[in-house]
Amino acid sequence: MRYLLLTLLLFTVPAQAQTTLRLSGLTGELEANVQRYLDRYAATEISTSLRFQSRLEQDIGTALQALGYYHSEIDISLQRNGHNGSRLLIRVTPGEPTRIKETDLQILGDAQNDADFLVLLAQAPQAGDIVHHGRYDSFKAALNSLAQRKGYFDARFSLQRLEVAPSRREAFVRLHFDSGTRYRFGRVSFSGQQIASDRLQSLVPFQAGAPYLASQLGELNQALANTNWFSSILVTADTEEITEHTLPINIELAPRKRNSIETGIGYSDDVGARLKLNWLKPWLNERGHSLNTKLAISGAEQSVEAAYKLPLQSVATDFWQLQYGLRNRDYQDTRAIESNLALERHWLLANDWYRTASIRWLYEDYTQADQEDSSSLLMPGISFSRSRQSGSGMPRQADRLLLGIEVSDPSWGSDASFVRLRGRAGYIDSFGDRHRMVSRLDAGAILMETVENLPPSLRFFAGGDNNLRGYAYESVSPLNQQGELIGGRYMATASLEYQYRVTGNWWLATFADYGSAWTDSPDWKRGVGFGVRWGSPIGAVRIDFAWGLDAEGSPFQLHFSLGPEL
C-alpha cells in the first residue's frame, strides 16, 4: 500500500514552472549580439533570483560593450503568468556609443610598400567609427593572415592596444605591425615521381628567388593534380634549409596506378539502357604520355574511341592528341558506320580559354531515310572553349562556352565542299542556398546548298536528354516526302531550368526547352516538364519527366542522365 501511495504522489507533483526571457529596446547588430549571449543559458539556469538577474545584467553589458556601447541602461522586471511560470522582461536602452578619437596605424618592415597591405589598411578602424571589438580583432587577424600568405613569416605586432575611456566616450587604436623581411622561393625538389623532372618543373608557376606567395603553391598543387599522373601530392616548405630568407620547396609524389577502369550505366526513354567503359592509362612513360579508351553501348549506338595524349614541354598548357573512333548507329531513320581519325593540337590561353586546331578524316557508310551512300571527308578545323565552375556535384556557379569551325573541300581529297559551324553556351547561377538557375544554348549551321551529300553525323538533329526534352533522341529534323527524318542544315535549341533544394544534395527542377533543326525554315518545338536532381560526387544525376507540346504521337518522354549539367 505504501508503494502505491508513493507512486500516486509522484504523479501528482506539478512540473516546476519555467522562467523565460523577453528582450526589447534593441535592433540590428545590438539585438543579435545580446540575443547570442542570452541563448547560451540553459533553461534550468534561468530563474527569478537576484543573483541570476545580476549575472544577466553583466552579460548584456558585456555584449553591448563589445560593440562600443558602454553607457547602456538595463531594466529587468518580473512578469508572473500564474501556473504557467514567469517571464523576465529585459528593457535595454543602449545609450550613446563610444567612438574612436584617434588611430595610430603603422606597417613596418618590407610590407610597408606592399600594395596588398595598403589596401588592407584602408579597411582598418578609423577615427569617428564606433568602437567595435570584433572588427578590431578581425583586422589584426587579417594582417597576420595576409603576412603568412605573402611570406612575411617573422611578422609580429610591436604595439597592439585598444584604449577605451568610457567616461569621455573616447577610444584610441594603436597598432604597429612589423612584417620583417619577406621570404622568397628557393629551389623546388621532387621525389617519388615517375615523370621526368624537366616536365614537372614546367608546372612550377614561379622562379627561384621570386617573393613567396601561398596561392602559387596552391596553383602548383592543382597543376600536378590535373596531370592525372599521381595518386598523392604533398607540398612542404623545407624550413631546415632556409638561408637568407630563401625557402626551399619539397614535393613528395606517389605515382598513380598504370591502369584505371571506370564503368557507368544510364537509361532514357529515347535509347534505353546505356553502358559505358572507360580504360585510362594515365602515364605510359617518363614523358607523361597517356592513353584513354572509351566504350559505349546502347540499343541505338555503339562506339569505341582511343585517344593518345602527348604533353609538350609546357605540360599544363600544350599537348598533341591522336584520336581514333569507330561508331555504329541504328536509330530512327539513320543507319551508319563511321570511322574517325583526328590529330589535334591543344593550347591553354589566357582566362581559361582552350584553343584546339585539328585535322580530321571521316569515313561514313550510311543509310539516311531513303538515301544510301558513303562519304570520305578531310576536315581541318579550329575551336575555342572555356569551362569554369565553383564546387563539384552541383556547382554554385559555372559557365561553359564552345565555338568551332570545320572546313571541307574537294581540292584536298574530300567528297564535298562545306563549312560547318558549332556553338554551345551554358550558365549556372545560385541564389542563396536553395535556388539555382541553369540555362543552355546550342546552335549549328552548315554552309552549303544541300545536306544530301553529307553523312548523318554532320547533319543536325534535335531532341533528347541534353538538347530538347519532351522529344525522342534526334527525332526533330526536316522530313522527306515519306515522312522520314533526313537531318537539317541548321539547328538551334535553348533551355531554361529552375531548381529548388529540398534537402541535402536533393533538388526538384522545372524546365522549358525550345528549338528546332531545319533546312529552309524552322518548325519550332516546345518542351516542358519537371525532374529530380541528386548532386553526386561525379556530377548531377538527373531524372526528367518531359512533355513535348508540339510532338506528334505520345508527348511524354522520360530522360535520365548522369554527369556535368553543361
Named regions from a protein language model:
Residues 69, 329-336, 408-417, 549:
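Outer-membrane beta-barrel proteins
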Residues 401-409, 416-449:
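Transmembrane beta-barrel strand/turn architecture of Gram-negative outer membrane proteins
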Residues 110-116, 213-402, 429, 437, ...:
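Gram-negative/organellar outer-membrane beta-barrel architecture
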Residues 1-7:
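Sec-dependent signal peptide recognition
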Residues 367-371, 415, 449-460, 522-524:
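Outer-membrane beta-barrel and related beta-rich outer-membrane complex signature
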Residues 12-14:
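N-terminal signal peptide c-region/cleavage motif recognized by signal peptidases
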Residues 18-29, 36-269, 278, 292-310, ...:
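Periplasmic polypeptide-binding modules associated with outer-membrane biogenesis and secretion
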Residues 433-511, 517-519:
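Extracytoplasmic gating/loop element in the C-terminal half of outer-membrane beta-barrel translocons
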